[in-house]
Each structure stands twice: as structure tokens, then as C-alpha cells.
Amino acid sequence: MTKVLVTGFGPYGVTPDNPAQFTAEALDGRTIAGATVVSRIVPGAYFDSIAAAEQAIAEVDPQLVIMLGEYPGRAMLTVERLAQNINDCGRYGLADTAGKVLVGEPTDPDGPVAYHATVPVHEMVLAMRAAGIPADVSDAAGTFVCNHLMYGVLHHIATQNLPIRAGWVHLPCLPMVAALDRNLGVPSMSVETAVAGLVAGIEAAVQHSADTREPVPSRLQI
């Protein structure tokens, strides 16, 4: 049976409740398009996150990896197209959960500049929209631990020649976090809505080994 590994992060920075954790946990054990979902919460720290994901890949032996993270300020699910070989959380005024601040450092000095997601990004976005969930394609995964982990997992898969497809979905803040005084006006999305979008997206990823070449209208500005 096909297995899908879903990863999420716990609290970090000024985010006390991470939608990636709650969404990953809600998906754990589900069967989607005949595939079993196995979720793992990984550390929100540079390099530790990659090591934990590599261990989960070895244990679960998935055919598909979908990684989740929060992107404050975005109003919809965003499926990332690229992961860069650069880390810079100093620009955000943030440290990772181990207290580490990286500024302009690569994830792997010998690795390529970037990796493309190997999931059908357009098909996933179209499936999410068809399910009534706002979603878009993104070409900017940031330079914090989300981008770092996406790059690290894709690099691991490529260098180990593993038969695994992998990609990243960013989630808006949770309503309970957007309701905090410091976050008023920040877009949010409930766990239930995010889960519905991920179910549709994972189904598309399981069913489509190649992406559509049809253009996907985009409104993403950040």
C-alpha cells in the first residue's frame, strides 16, 4: 500500500499554536486515494529538522512526502515550487527553536542552488480549489526552517536516489493566533479547512505522477 509521510512543526517564535502540527496530527492514520497517511512532528530547528525527517523516511518508507509549515500573512494554502540552498532567519528577527540564528548560510555548501518540488504542484492547487479551499502556487518558501527542511529532504532523496516524491504546503495562521492583539488583521484558516485542502491536495499528488501543463491563475503577492 502507498504511504504518505506528512511532517509538521510545533510552536516557534511568537507562534504558540502551529497549524502545521494540528493539521499533520489530524491527517495521521487517514486513508486518502488508497494511500495511508503517517504524520510526524519534527523539531523546528535547523539541521535537526532534516535529521528527524530522514529518520521518519527510513521508518515509514513512504512513496510521497508532504511537509507542512506556517506562513504568517498568507491567506490561503500555498504549494511551494522551489526550495533554496540558503538560510536567513535574522531577516525575520527570529531564531529557530534551538535558539540558532543563521544569516546567509547554505544548508549544504556542496548542494545545488535550489530544488524543484517533485509533487504535481499545479494539480494539487487545482484540486484544493475544486474542493472549495483557497490555494495558490508559491515560488518563495522563505529562508527559515520551512525552506531549510524542504531543501534538506529533497537533497536527501536526490543524493540517495530514493523513489520518493516530495513537496511543501504552507498554511495561514490559526484563528486563535490571528486573534492575538499583536496579530489583528493577519489572515487565518481553521484546522478543518486546512485539512480539507490537504486531503484534496494529497489525493491529487497520489493520483498524478506528472503535473498539468495548463496555466494556473495566480493572485499570490508575497
From Swiss-Prot:
One of its GO terms (molecular function) is pyroglutamyl-peptidase activity. Homotetramer. The active site is at E80, C146, H170. Removes 5-oxoproline from various penultimate amino acid residues except L-proline. It comes from the Bacteria. It holds the Pfam family Peptidase_C15. PROSITE patterns: PYRASE_CYS (PS01334), PYRASE_GLU (PS01333). The keyword Hydrolase applies. This is Pyrrolidone-carboxylate peptidase. HAMAP family: Pyrrolid_peptidase. PANTHER family: PROTEASE FAMILY C15 PYROGLUTAMYL-PEPTIDASE I-RELATED, PYROGLUTAMYL-PEPTIDASE I. Belongs to the peptidase C15 family. Keywords: Cytoplasm, Hydrolase, Protease, Thiol protease. Its main location: cytoplasm. The keyword Cytoplasm applies. GO terms for biological process: proteolysis. It is found in: Cytoplasm. Its EC number is 3.4.19.3. It catalyses: Release of an N-terminal pyroglutamyl group from a polypeptide, the second amino acid generally not being Pro. One of its GO terms (cellular component) is cytosol. The lineage of its organism: Bacteria, Bacillati, Actinomycetota, Actinomycetes, Mycobacteriales.
